[in-house]
C-alpha cells in the first residue's frame, strides 16, 4: 500500500503505515550534527567502532536503565542504526539452523534479520487479556528447545505496543537460562511507556547481566530516524565477535550522525518525556475515535493493531477500504509471522 500511495503522489493521503513522527529531535542533537558537517574528523572511516563520546553516553544510558556498570571501550560499539546492530548481533551468535524465539506479531525487520543470519524464528503468540496484550507464557516455555540460541525481545514492541510485565520478564529469563541462550533486547523504545511503570530492562534481572545483549537507537525516543545511529552493549565475552562482524558488515558508522546522537544522549533536555506524553495523548485520541472498533490498546510505542476479522473482513480488505478513502495502513497479512 505504501508503494501504491507513492505512485499516486497524493500529498493529502494519511500515511499510517510507516513509523515516522513529526516531533522534532532534541535541539542539541541538531546543533551538534550541523557542526559535525564542517569537521574533518566527522568525515572519516575512523574510529571503526564509533566515537568515544557516543560510546560513553550509551554506556551511561545503559547504567541508568539497569544499575549495571558498563565499560564503554570494552562493552559498547556503535552501529548504523538499531536494525544493523540487531543483524550484527545475530550474525555473531547464530549458526545456521539455530532457533530464535520472538513474539508474534513482531516487527518484520526483526524476523527477517533472524532469517538473514541463518536462524529459524520460533513464534510465541501474544494474547489479549483484559483488553491488553500479554505474552503466552505456556507457548514461550514450549518454544524452548536444544536448538534455542536466543530470545529476541522488544518492550514496547512493534506493532502491538505490548510492554512486558515483571512476570513475563521472569519467564523469559528462566527460559534463557534453561536453554543457555542469549537475550537480544531491542531497547529502541524502552522509555515510551504509557503505563506509568518504571522501565524493566532484562539485564537488571537476577543472573542476566552476562546473558543480555542490548541494542539501542536514537530513532524512536529521540525522534532521530534519519541519523541511522544505534549502539550495542553486551558482556565482554561476546563483544569482540560482534565488533568483528560490524567491521566486516558495515565497516564504519555514520560520521556526521554520531556527534548528534552523543549530544542527544547527553542532553539534559532530550524531550523524551514530553514526546511520550504527546504520543500517549495521540493514542488516547485514536482509541476514543475508534471506540466502536476492536482495537487493543498499546501500553507504549508508536503503533497499534485493529482486529479486522471481527468487522467481517480480512486485514487486506480493510487496508484496501482505507486506501480508497485516502488513508494508508499496513495489513497484518504482510507480517512474516503466523498471527495476522
Segments from the language model and where they lie:
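PLP-dependent class I/II
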Residues: 7-14, 19-36, 63-340
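Glycine-rich loop-to-alpha-helix module at the N-terminal edge of alpha/beta enzyme cores
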Residues: 16, 39-44, 57-60, 64
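Short beta-strand to alpha-helix junction loop
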Residues: 49-50
Amino acid at each position: 500500500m505504501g508503494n501504491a500511495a507513492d505512485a499516486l503522489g497524493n500529498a493529502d493521503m494519511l500515511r499510517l503505515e510507516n513509523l515516522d513522527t513529526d516531533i522534532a529531535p532534541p535541539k542539541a542533537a541538531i546543533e551538534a550534527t550541523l557542526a559535525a558537517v564542517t569537521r574533518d574528523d566527522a568525515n572519516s572511516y575512523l574510529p571503526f567502532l564509533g566515537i568515544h563520546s557516543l560510546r560513553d553516553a550509551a554506556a551511561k544510558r545503559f547504567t541508568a536503565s539497569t544499575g549495571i556498570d558498563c565499560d564503554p571501550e570494552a562493552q559498547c560499539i556503535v552501529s548504523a542504526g538499531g536494525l544493523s546492530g540487531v543483524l550484527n548481533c545475530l550474525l555473531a551468535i547464530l549458526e545456521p539452523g539455530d532457533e530464535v524465539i520472538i513474539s508474534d506479531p513482531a516487527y518484520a525487520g526483526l524476523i527477517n534479520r533472524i532469517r538473514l543470519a541463518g536462524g529459524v524464528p520460533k513464534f510465541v503468540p501474544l494474547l489479549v487479556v483484559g483488553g491488553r496484550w500479554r505474552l503466552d507464557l505456556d507457548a514461550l516455555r514450549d518454544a524452548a528447545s536444544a536448538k534455542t540460541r536466543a530470545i529476541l525481545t522488544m518492550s514496547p514492541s512493534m506493532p502491538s505496543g505490548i510492554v512486558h510485565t515483571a512476570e513475563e520478564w521472569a519467564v523469559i529469563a528462566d527460559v534463557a537460562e534453561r536453554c543457555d541462550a542469549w537475550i537480544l533486547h531491542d531497547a529502541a523504545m524502552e522509555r515510551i511507556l504509557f503505563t506509568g511503570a518504571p522501565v524493566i530492562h532484562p539485564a537488571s534481572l537476577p543472573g542476566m547481566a552476562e546473558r543480555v545483549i542490548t541494542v539501542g537507537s536514537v530513532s524512536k525516543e529521540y525522534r532521530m530516524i534519519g541519523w541511522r545511529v544505534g549502539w550495542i552493549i553486551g558482556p565482554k565475552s561476546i563483544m569482540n565477535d560482534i565488533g568483528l562482524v560490524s567491521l566486516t558488515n558495515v565497516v564504519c558508522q555514520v560520521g556526521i550522525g554520531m556527534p548528534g546522537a552523543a549530544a542527544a544522549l547527553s542532553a539534559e533536555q532530550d524531550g523524551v518525556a514530553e514526546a511520550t506524553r504527546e504520543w500517549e495523548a495521540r493514542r488516547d485520541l485514536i482509541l476514543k475515535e475508534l471506540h466502536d472498533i476492536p482495537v487493543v490498546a498499546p501500553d507504549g510505542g508508536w503503533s497499534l493493531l485493529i482486529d479486522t476479522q471481527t468487522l467481517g473482513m480480512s486485514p487486506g480488505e480493510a487496508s484496501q477500504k482505507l486506501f480508497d478513502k485516502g488513508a494508508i495502513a499496513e495489513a497484518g497479512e504482510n507480517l512474516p509471522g503466523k498471527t495476522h
